[in-house]
Amino acid sequence: TREGTAHNARPLRDGSILFAMNSVQKPDDLYRLDRNGRVTQLTAVNAARLAELDPVTFTKWNFAGANNATVWGYTLKPAGAQGKLPVAFIVHGGPQGSFNNSWSYRWNP
């Protein structure tokens, strides 16, 4: 989704779906998708800690690659960053996996 990456979905008896969702900016919390398509956040496990941090700016962009295939990229900048900044360029191979708008317990902390 635009808000992050949903995973571990489980159907509930009332027809709703319980799932976890995270993004580059925050680790997992639990959500409920009701039968009408409304999403409700159920937990905010790290809200207090995240409120102490300056959020990053997350931008998704793309360009035409080999054979005119769409290649996606992401830019993350510290809060308030302006002008030229140092760059960390991470190339991820595939097709077994890809980067997306998700929290990495390996890289984000």
Regions found by a protein language model. Name each.
Residues 1-3:
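Surface loop/turn motifs at the tips and blade-to-blade linkers of beta-strand repeat domains
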